[in-house]
């Protein structure tokens, strides 16, 4: 049996959400857990996976086993009109078997997102990702205002989870506060999973 891990599951089209996933993974490791970073393949207009089984680069694709066996979950997506991107939704829609068995009940979870514009739907996207987690019975974590960067940020960061203003071309790097908030969220998730597992 493998050691406990936090699954950092995301979809990223231009790389901003992928970078957030890496920073959240750093926070998870600071919290004492292994971070297992996974992504999902793009989908076609027919709503089927259209990428090879193993990606040419970047994180491996997530499996239901990755999700079932995690000690906690960080879920990330770029914003698509205030919602999570369809590849992530497609993956989550296929988790009914885990819901039926209660595999995720009582496990901690957090969400993160990136947007092209400052007011591009960060919080509504985070809320859209929280809904399936609540249906699975997961314990939702956000970022408390005791985290100073949440009060100082001029870009991303919400009490619902980490966020990033990536710019219209998706190339704006995470700023100091966004980095801090990603790592803080990952660390909080790992520490909570540790407390729940003890």
Swiss-Prot record:
It catalyses: a quinone + NADH + H(+) = a quinol + NAD(+); a quinone + NADPH + H(+) = a quinol + NADP(+). One of its GO terms (biological process) is cellular response to oxidative stress. Keywords: Flavoprotein, FMN, NAD, NADP, Nucleotide-binding, Oxidoreductase. The keyword Metal-binding does not apply. It comes from the Bacteria. GO terms for molecular function: electron transfer activity; FMN binding; NAD(P)H dehydrogenase (quinone) activity; NADH:ubiquinone reductase (non-electrogenic) activity; NADPH dehydrogenase (quinone) activity; oxidoreductase activity, acting on NAD(P)H, quinone or similar compound as acceptor. FMN binds at residues 12-17, 79-81, 114-120, 135. The keyword NADP applies. Its cofactor is FMN. Pfam families: FMN_red (PF03358). Binds 1 FMN per monomer. It is an enzyme of class 1 (oxidoreductase). Its EC number is 1.6.5.2. GO terms for cellular component: membrane. Residues 6-190 form the Flavodoxin-like domain. Signal peptide: none annotated. Disulfide bonds: none annotated. This is NAD(P)H dehydrogenase (quinone). It comes from Pseudomonas aeruginosa (strain ATCC 15692 / DSM 22644 / CIP 104116 / JCM 14847 / LMG 12228 / 1C / PRS 101 / PAO1). The lineage of its organism: Bacteria, Pseudomonadati, Pseudomonadota, Gammaproteobacteria, Pseudomonadales.
